[in-house]
Amino acid sequence: MLKPTEDYSDYIQRLFPSRDEFGDLKKIKTFTFQVTNDCSLCCTYCYELNKSKDYLSFETVKRVIDYIFEQAKLPDTILSYEKNEGIIIDFIGGEPFLNIEVILQIINYFETRLIEEDSPWLFFHRYSFSSNGVAYRNSKVQEMIKIYGDLLSIGITVDGYKELHDKCRIFPNGAGSYELAVDAAIDLKNKTGSDSTKITLCPENIDKFFGAVTNMLSLGFVHINANCVFEEGWELKDAKILYQQMKKISDYLFENDLEDKCYISIFNKDNFCPLEDTEDNNKNWCGGTGEMIAVDYKGDFFPCLRYMETSLPKDRKPLIVGNLDCGIYTREEDKKTLEFLESITRKSQSPDKCLVCPIAKGCAWCSGYNYSKFGTPNKRATFICIMHKATGLGNWYFWAKEAEKKKIKCEFINYLPKEEAIEIMGENDFKMLSKVR
């Protein structure tokens, strides 16, 4: 496998490619602008439940940016230069490019303030986007890429190939968006050299994973980040399908000598083993408990966009931690919220089965989804559990195949108990892989 591009350290290295010239960056702050609640698509797996036609205005943006720089100069604030040697301005929606005029105003004004303040962030800032690609050809989007290309990280989601993509990523009238998304992704790759893409797996499309990967590879996207959604709905049958899909992908890669020419995030030999009981391993996986800040069109601040009204069921109150009038984490109730968020650990939120799980390493969760589902970020949703097990077994197959092909020792050890493994992969595969040393 090629080196990954999307773990945190590599994400920072990609956004700040020259950072080694200036020394290590101890901390990068991510500040998210939800520039609109509106979207051109109605994706079946979208976690934003309550979209609207609300758009962030430049008047609100200007106040937010002024507040960021005001707080950055003060010691011991969540945005201070002392704590944050760089900053990523993240744009999300809905679909962010629907508000491209304001996005350009945000970037222009932020760049102006960086120069005016002689800010330490002048050389350490980037703008990040997650887009469905539908509005990519907008002339303002192209203008932004032309002017600020080196400062941008734009992710266009393409769920593999047409049938798969158009099954989930659809317009309100039911039409698919594959052609527009692929056109955007390929043009962006040609202009910026970005050869990565993201595939979101859910129960509705898990059986199309193999075709999705092979199609993206054929289009020249050799860094493929794939993940299963955290939401409820996964069953044993889905785990069996995922394992078989990972087998097919593995066979395809080795048969075509592609195993060292691409990166597929779901294959990771360093995960799927027990976690040592250390202080570092007890930290919260997710950054949505005090590390990130998001702002909506009203100027309200949140620990993460998934605590906003757009991402929550009707009976769940948004978790607001400040506004433009009072600031971030300044009111007593907000200070208590921050103290609570920062106290959340793997142990505090996990059920016993997770703490003793033999393949706990690499099993992820989303604190915002925990809040959405249970009303607290300190209760871990485990709907993804069966898929983590299947992913581990798919890795066992991949790394065993690598060992056989290269005539080397298999570097992957299966820690999942035999009974649980056989339930997903079958007895024949379990016996076959157990013989590989």
Regions found by a protein language model. Give the residues of each.
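Radical SAM/AdoMet-radical enzyme domain recognition
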Residues: 69-92, 99-231
